[in-house]
């Protein structure tokens, strides 16, 4: 049974801003993609944001809100309730007596009367949620599903990345072109999946695959990326020549060089789509947020323009060409060896 992405909405940063790191009581201003006004998002505010995204996406897909009790919700995040704990601490409120990833799922289950599933596989959390939602639809368990990826600023995550010397201090986020570190971001996205296309803007999901990298828990190995791409192409029944563009991982770190090498060798005919220079690395939310980024580009008929010139003009970046109808590879890599990906085939691209 086929699976289609029929609607996507997101709330992400509009511009690159700054966030203060406080490691060892030494303050330093680092670039950060801030999407929300609140320094720390409380749990009630997070519920409000998730509900608003669910409503926007459902209406965009042409669904009635009354049918959501038959639509499973799959959540993907890295932080889950950490921002709320920090909010409570900052405002002199007691911390939760129990710590559980299922707190948000329990609330949404009561709110909508449906099954809710939580995924925590580091940076691929919401990507894995997409993969499992698609499996549910393929196996006829449901006709529709919602996938939500969310990541809110919290100091625990931010300071840990800073302590590992992984964060960029540059004014622009230039992965692949001039990798100088990761720029983190916050945001939320919601994807609507169905077992049939409901409009010209629907995208078919093909070749959905996952892989666990057993070689390296903190970096992405070349062999694992090659195997992931092979699996996706094989499951989709496509050749490398048929892939018109690739939404790359491209975090701006040490793995960029390896990723570029693999793409040049395995997909020499494809252009590359960079998403993180516009939204930052949103960690567990990136699967949903970057898929929404790509889906919205299909609706607009073009990708947003980069605000910097590539240092390497030989990079085949898709940002400088109109989008065309065809097959788009979309993959995600994460700490702990988790990886996932699929191919999107839009039914129609505006002016495409």
Where are the regions that the model predicts?
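Glycine-rich anion/phosphate-binding loop at the beta-strand->alpha-helix junction
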Residues: 144, 149-153
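Short, conserved alpha-helix that lines the donor NDP-sugar binding/gating region
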Residues: 130-134
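Conserved "HGTGT" condensation-loop signature of ketosynthase/thiolase-family condensing enzymes
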Residues: 1-116, 135-138, 154, 163-183, ...
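Compositionally biased, intrinsically disordered linkers/stalks adjacent to structured regions
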Residues: 120-122
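Short conserved active-site loop signatures built around small residues
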Residues: 126
């Amino acid at each position: 049974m086929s699976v289609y992405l029929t609607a996507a909405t997101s709330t992400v940063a509009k511009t690159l801003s700054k966030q203060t790191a406080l490691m060892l009581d030494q303050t330093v201003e680092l670039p950060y993609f801030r999407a929300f006004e609140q320094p720390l998002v409380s749990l009630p505010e997070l519920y409000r944001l998730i509900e608003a995204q669910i409503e926007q996406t459902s209406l965009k897909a042409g669904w009635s809100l009354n049918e959501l009790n038959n639509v499973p919700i799959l959540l993907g995040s890295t932080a889950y309730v950490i921002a709320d704990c920090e909010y409570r601490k900052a405002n002199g409120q007691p911390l939760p007596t129990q710590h559980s990833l299922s707190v948000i799922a329990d609330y949404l289950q009561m709110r909508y009367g449906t099954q809710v599933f939580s995924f925590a596989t580091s940076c691929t959390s919401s990507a894995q949620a997409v993969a499992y939602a698609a499996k549910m639809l393929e196996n006829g368990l449901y006709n529709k599903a919602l996938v939500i990826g969310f990541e809110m600023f919290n100091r625990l995550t931010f300071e840990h990345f800073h302590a590992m010397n992984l964060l960029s201090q540059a004014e622009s986020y230039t992965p692949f072109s001039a990798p100088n570190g990761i720029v983190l971001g916050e945001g939320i996205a919601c994807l609507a999946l169905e077992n049939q296309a409901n409009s010209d803007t629907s995208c078919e999901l093909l070749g959905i695959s996952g892989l666990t990298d057993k070689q390296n828990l903190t970096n992405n190995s070349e062999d694992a990326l090659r195997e992931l791409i092979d699996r996706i192409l094989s499951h989709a029944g496509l050749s490398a020549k048929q892939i018109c563009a690739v939404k790359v991982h491209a975090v701006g770190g040490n793995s960029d060089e390896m990723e570029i090498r693999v793409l040049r060798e395995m997909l020499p005919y494809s252009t590359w789509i960079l998403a993180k220079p516009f939204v930052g690395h949103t960690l567990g939310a990136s699967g949903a947020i970057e898929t929404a980024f790509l889906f919205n580009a299909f609706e607009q008929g073009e990708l947003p323009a980069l605000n910097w010139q590539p240092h390497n003009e030989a990079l085949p970046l898709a940002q400088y060409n109109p989008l065309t109808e065809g097959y788009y590879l979309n993959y995600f890599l994460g700490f702990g060896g988790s990886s996932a990906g699929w191919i999107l085939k839009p039914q129609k691209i505006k002016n495409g």
